Regions:
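Surface-exposed alpha-helical segments enriched in charged/polar residues
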Residues: 1-2, 94
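Short acidic, glycine/serine/threonine-rich loops at helix termini
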Residues: 3, 24-25
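An acidic- and aromatic-residue-enriched active-site/binding cleft used to recognize and process polar
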Residues: 15-17, 108-109
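Conserved beta-strand signature within the Rossmann-like core of class I S-adenosyl-L-methionine
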Residues: 3-15
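Switch/connector loops and helix/strand junctions flanking conserved nucleotide-binding motifs
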Residues: 20-22
Length: 201
């Protein structure tokens, strides 16, 4: 957080935690969903993507308890399975605000051609569909318009975000969702430390 200067931006994308949580709602821990190429998306085709649920939580709250929802993702483009953790963006908003970041305002969004500081890839795709035939946007989106059904399913599980750094100081400690912020920060720090150890392995 402290490596970003005031006036700088923190930009990224990931699977949307709550969207993925709902996607896997009826899946047991250790099981998952698999997508194959081809029109019928059946197992006779080549596996292009797979998600395996590695948690057994039954709900996702907007606090530090939502940071340990592990999933394993297989992606055919790299032919590898890797561990990810669901991002609860409503909780991330709270964390970012606490550390001096805010979402972009309407003028800032207008300058970069976006409607939201955080939104789904489905929204971006729908916006692209309205723009793709305009002269200004001609050729701008490459092959995005011709995504397959499976590629859309994967893509629409993702969210983009843009936060702007507006101050260095951290907000005072207060109670949020029944949990002391200091305790919240400690638990978050412990999770990150354990995640670093797991990455080293």
């Amino acid at each position: 957080m402290n490596v970003t200067q005031v006036g700088g931006y923190f930009v990224g994308t990931s699977y949307d935690g709550k969207t993925m949580f709902d996607y896997l709602k009826d899946v047991k821990k250790g099981d998952g969903k698999t997508l194959y190429d081809g029109v019928e998306n059946d197992s006779q085709g080549t596996k292009i993507w797979e998600v395996t649920k590695q948690y057994d939580y039954t709900n996702m709250e907007d606090n530090v308890s939502s940071i340990n929802y592990a999933i394993d993702i297989y992606q055919d483009s790299i032919n590898k399975t890797f561990r990810e953790y669901l991002v609860n963006y409503d909780y991330l908003d709270t964390i970012m605000e606490r550390h001096g970041f805010r979402k972009l305002n309407s003028d800032e969004l207008k300058n970069i051609g976006l409607n939201k500081s955080r939104g789904s890839f489905r929204e971006l795709y729908n916006h692209m569909q309205t723009m793709v035939h305009s002269q200004i946007s001609h050729g701008k989106y490459g092959k995005a318009e011709s995504m397959t059904m499976q590629e859309k399913e994967i893509s629409f599980l993702n969210t983009y975000f843009i936060y702007k750094k507006v101050r260095h100081e951290t907000l005072p400690v207060k109670l949020t969702h029944g949990m002391d912020v200091k305790e919240d920060e400690i638990r978050l720090s412990e999770f990150i430390t354990n995640l670093d150890k797991e990455t080293v392995k």
